[in-house]
């Protein structure tokens, strides 16, 4: 059984017991989080597709950890002009473990 949920403006395919990284959620470590924006639920041959969301669909997850991703380096450079700008960015994420899929 798996579901497709919408979180942080992105779609994620999730299954029970799966651990995945999402955009930062405002929830404490160990807290339960519910995702009610379920786009699709599949259980074998039984497929439910929402328009846009599955009615009564809910995915429950537990927050495992918060952290920051790898650094992305940004460089702006203009040739022959002695002009160079450097910046870096580390995106915050929340790691969750899917505990239940209800549809």
Swiss-Prot record:
Give the multimer and partner information.
Part of the 50S ribosomal subunit. Contacts protein L20.
- PROSITE patterns from the entry? RIBOSOMAL_L21 (PS01169)
Instruction: Spell out the GO cellular component terms annotated for this protein, sorted alphabetically and separated by semicolons.
Output: cytoplasm; ribonucleoprotein complex; ribosome
Its keywords, alphabetically, are: Ribonucleoprotein, Ribosomal protein, RNA-binding, rRNA-binding
InterPro entries linked to this entry: bL21-like (IPR028909), bL21-like_sf (IPR036164), Ribosomal_bL21 (IPR001787), Ribosomal_bL21_CS (IPR018258)
User: What's the name of the protein?
Assistant: Large ribosomal subunit protein bL21
What is the purpose of this protein? This protein binds to 23S rRNA in the presence of protein L20.
What's the family?
Answer: Belongs to the bacterial ribosomal protein bL21 family.
Look up keyword rRNA-binding and say if it applies.
yes
- Disulphide bonds annotated for this chain are none
What does the entry give for GO biological process? translation
């Amino acid at each position: 059984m798996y579901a497709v949920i919408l979180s942080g403006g992105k779609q994620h395919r999730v299954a029970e017991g799966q651990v995945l990284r999402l955009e930062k959620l405002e929830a404490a470590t160990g807290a339960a989080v519910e995702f009610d924006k379920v786009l699709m639920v599949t259980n074998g041959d039984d497929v439910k597709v929402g328009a846009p969301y599955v009615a009564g669909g809910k995915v429950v997850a537990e927050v495992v950890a918060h952290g920051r991703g790898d650094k992305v380096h940004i460089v702006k450079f203009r040739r022959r002009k002695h002009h160079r700008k450097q910046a870096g960015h580390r995106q915050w994420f929340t790691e969750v473990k899917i505990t239940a899929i209800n549809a």
